[in-house]
């Protein structure tokens, strides 16, 4: 019996959704950073095994939006709930339920699909706090079909979670070819890798005002990639921070990004990144559409 279906991973920003998917796939497909709201599009990740095919939808963290980009991110997350077979609600061991989690759970109460509670980062918290968190969530929202404490970064209980997901999947066909692991284009993933390096290396006030626009991506006569990208920011002061003294920060971002892009593309890469100011781009519908936020 072959099973298949779609699974949404949903939760507050920065609870480890992308880390979980990257762990399951053993591929760097979703941007991972310690800063919240790093995932902006619902990346579809496809896991095909002998007895099943699971299509994971990695959503932006749900939150109350502050600008048009934020509204887009929340809309994408809400749309991801429609037409899926299982919802994985992910949180971290904080004891009491926070307002952000309650905001999401009140929406999940209304859906018919099975919802799993995934408590991540158990390796970073003591067992008492983990147990308290599990009890408080179960008591407040008894609709969870399964409750699984995990560590996505340390690979703890991830296999158990995977087996439980298979248990709830319906019989179905292979929706995608066996060798396909994502529906995202290479250009999108390359842009996300560059943005991830900026998120990791830059100070707190800059990253969420950053986007990466792919200008050109082509192979040269040697079969190596030549990539030109522009990093957009909202202020002149941010541009100076991104470039750094004598171009040192931009060089570091580009160097780290190139290393990961070469691993992803399995090819030598020549990467050039420029920085451009587009004031308040996160509230400009035209720019958002140009960058692919079309929801």
Swiss-Prot record:
Keyword Cell wall biogenesis/degradation set for record: no
Entry keywords, A to Z: Cell membrane, Cytoplasm, GTP-binding, Membrane, Nucleotide-binding, Ribosome biogenesis, RNA-binding, rRNA-binding
SUPFAM superfamilies: P-loop containing nucleoside triphosphate hydrolases (SSF52540), Prokaryotic type KH domain (KH-domain type II) (SSF54814)
Region called G3, residue ranges: 58-61
Domain spans labelled Era-type G: 3-171
A single GO molecular function term of this UniProt record: GTP binding
Region spans: G2: 37-41
Subcellular location as annotated: Cytoplasm; Cell membrane
Spans annotated as G5: 150-152
Annotated family: Belongs to the TRAFAC class TrmE-Era-EngA-EngB-Septin-like GTPase superfamily. Era GTPase family.
UniProt function note: An essential GTPase that binds both GDP and GTP, with rapid nucleotide exchange. Plays a role in 16S rRNA processing and 30S ribosomal subunit biogenesis and possibly also in cell cycle regulation and energy metabolism.
Subunit details: Monomer.
Protein name: GTPase Era
GN (gene name): era
């Amino acid at each position: 019996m072959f099973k298949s279906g779609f699974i949404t991973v949903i939760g507050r920003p920065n609870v480890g959704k992308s880390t979980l998917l990257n762990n399951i796939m053993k591929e760097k497909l979703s941007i991972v950073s310690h800063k919240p709201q790093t995932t902006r599009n619902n990346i579809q990740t496809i896991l095909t095994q002998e007895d099943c095919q699971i299509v994971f939808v990695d959503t932006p963290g749900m939150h109350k939006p502050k600008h048009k980009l934020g509204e887009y991110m929340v809309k994408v997350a809400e749309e991801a709930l429609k037409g899926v077979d299982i919802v994985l609600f992910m949180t971290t061991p904080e004891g009491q339920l926070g307002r952000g989690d309650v905001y999401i759970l009140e929406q999940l109460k209304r859906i018919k699909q099975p919802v799993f509670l995934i408590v991540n980062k158990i390796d970073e918290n003591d067992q008492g706090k983990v147990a308290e968190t599990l009890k408080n969530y179960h008591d407040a929202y008894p609709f969870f079909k399964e409750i699984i404490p995990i560590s996505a970064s340390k690979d703890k209980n991830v296999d158990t979670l995977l087996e439980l997901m298979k248990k709830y999947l319906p019989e179905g066909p292979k929706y995608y070819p066996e060798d396909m692991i994502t529906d995202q284009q290479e250009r999108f993933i390359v842009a996300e890798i560059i943005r991830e390096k900026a998120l990791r290396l830059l100070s707190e006030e800059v990253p969420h005002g950053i986007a990466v626009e792919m200008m050109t991506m082509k192979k040269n006569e040697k079969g190596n990639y030549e990539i030109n990208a522009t990093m957009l920011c909202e202020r002149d002061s941010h541009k100076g921070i991104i470039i750094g003294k004598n171009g040192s920060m931009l060089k570091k971002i580009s160097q780290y990004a190139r290393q990961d892009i070469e691993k992803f593309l399995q090819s030598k890469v020549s990467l050039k990144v420029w920085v451009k100011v587009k004031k308040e781009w996160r509230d400009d519908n035209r720019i958002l559409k140009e960058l692919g936020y079309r929801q």
